[in-house]
């Protein structure tokens, strides 16, 4: 049997993120995950949050078969097969796919981990705009990853990581929290909660103003 792609970082952070999610979210609901990658988070969260229906997605069609295999192997009734979703596309999910015919389906939560710093800045605006369209009233957008903050000394590891990202792609880089929250406000979302996480990461919760 071919081994599935594995992210050590996803294994390290999945439990701290889950602990935060269980404090933030209600007992049941529906969640859309953006940039699911290997699907490790989707499986871990869906297994622990059995009353949440979890929809994983990714913008890279090449990762979907392996993610689908991991999800099928998990055999969780509340975890759906992955879909192709590019936040920059005018429709979520992307052209040619649908949420089982529910093209305008909305969610109680949208979750996006480790995407904003490894994609162009335009994806931040697209994420906020799409979340505003796809969230139910009272719903939340939850993002996770490294951020720079005004008046908060940057961790040396994050400074080095940012330099490495920008050397690899000039459009990448750790984002300033103030810029992200300003972009969210343009779409009617405001920062509700900020949670410090291990390894100098933050988990942010946005909701409607």
Per-region residue spans from a language model:
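Core SAM-dependent methyltransferase catalytic element
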Residues: 189-209
